């Protein structure tokens, strides 16, 4: 972490702090209420370290066009409850009301500004120069002394409130980013083998991309698949996964033929290192079937079967490092939760260094009471995968550049 300024690099007491967090959360489509608080709680340590500062929180929720693209007013209320401290909300990101509010703040006060993505400058600007000349940066930069970035789940984004201030004010890594980078770098640089990845859930494109990177780079020795990810690889192997399962992949993936072709290519090159389930539990019948037979068109592959659990658990038991992203099936329904429960429990019992990421993965771990038995439960989904895949991380690059510019 020597490349970044950390929170103990400066005396922040009495200072006005711009704190960029990621509290983007699922919203109940019926009631409009925030459904999870994990991302709020992840930032508590950083905020408490700023108890003697004036803290201005900047964040986003969803993106334009989505049903959950909402104001952050409710987010401020949720944060207030978690901190047991008033978090004032201002329905602007910049402007006269923000200026007046920040100028009247006392030490210990916390203010949350409006959803950054309500403003086109947040997502439309692509160059640092255009960001620095934006109303967002010009409107906010005169109000604060230091910029703290704690939004690990957004480190793969190059957006104005995330990277646009790096040459304007010292950019500092918050406690969450410090912890995330430390733990993930430990995993990345672990030289012990075997290393395995467990990839499940429904996000096929992400899992295929990470599979390709992990296998071609030699980062992992084996990949164990489950969920819709496994279904895609089975389809690529020429196995009849049934109409309902094919239709789900087609409906939820734009260029599904390209994805299946990519799966075929990976199987051709790394076939013995990509494991697919040998048996399944069907829904709604509840029948256990072999993966080699034809799956009835009216049935869903809802969970992995016992033979797969035994095979995967033996591999997990011998692993030295494990990355897991995505459940093995429809874990939310008790009848189809066994595969996820058994595989995640095997990881928890393992002596391997383990990292988990992705919203459904963390939700399943929490439901099973296993979160504290995983070495690191990351707040990042796409960000975690991108970082592990060796892609450029704009926020981390901004932190490095800012330290070079402002280091005395």
UniProtKB/Swiss-Prot annotation:
Family, per entry: Belongs to the phosphoglycerate kinase family.
Protein name: Phosphoglycerate kinase
Binding site for substrate: 22-24, 39, 60-63, 117, 157
Species, as recorded: Thermoplasma volcanium (strain ATCC 51530 / DSM 4299 / JCM 9571 / NBRC 15438 / GSS1)
Transmembrane domains' residue ranges: none
Keywords: ATP-binding, Cytoplasm, Glycolysis, Kinase, Nucleotide-binding, Transferase
PANTHER family hit by this protein: PHOSPHOGLYCERATE KINASE, PHOSPHOGLYCERATE KINASE 1, CHLOROPLASTIC-RELATED
Catalysed reactions, semicolon-separated: (2R)-3-phosphoglycerate + ATP = (2R)-3-phospho-glyceroyl phosphate + ADP
EC number: 2.7.2.3
Location in the cell: Cytoplasm
One GO BP: gluconeogenesis
Pathway it works in: Carbohydrate degradation; glycolysis; pyruvate from D-glyceraldehyde 3-phosphate: step 2/5
